[in-house]
């Protein structure tokens, strides 16, 4: 299934999200900047993309992830871990970046800074319960299943 995601360029320099390879799970998002943006170590910035999108409906979510190369090579990550964009959002896609390295990193205008993944999503009906079904794991949390 290939859902149709409408986009609107809010800035003429915006780059339409593209999949880098035929098997790519996410499309690249590019920075729309007037000048290069240097992030000092531990500095955060909201990087504009110049794009707004319309998802096909409430059964769809857009997830924004860091690009693995920027994270591993330069320590540039999403400040919020993963961006979650609901189907009713119509504003600009902006990428909250943080530089976790010990060196400054400069984002260039037009640079690919994040990945946009479109996925199905359910809205759950939350129901109170006095008891929950027992499982082998039970209440075991962080690290409880071993290395």
Regions found by a protein language model. Give the residues of each.
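DUTPase catalytic domain/fold
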Residues: 1-147
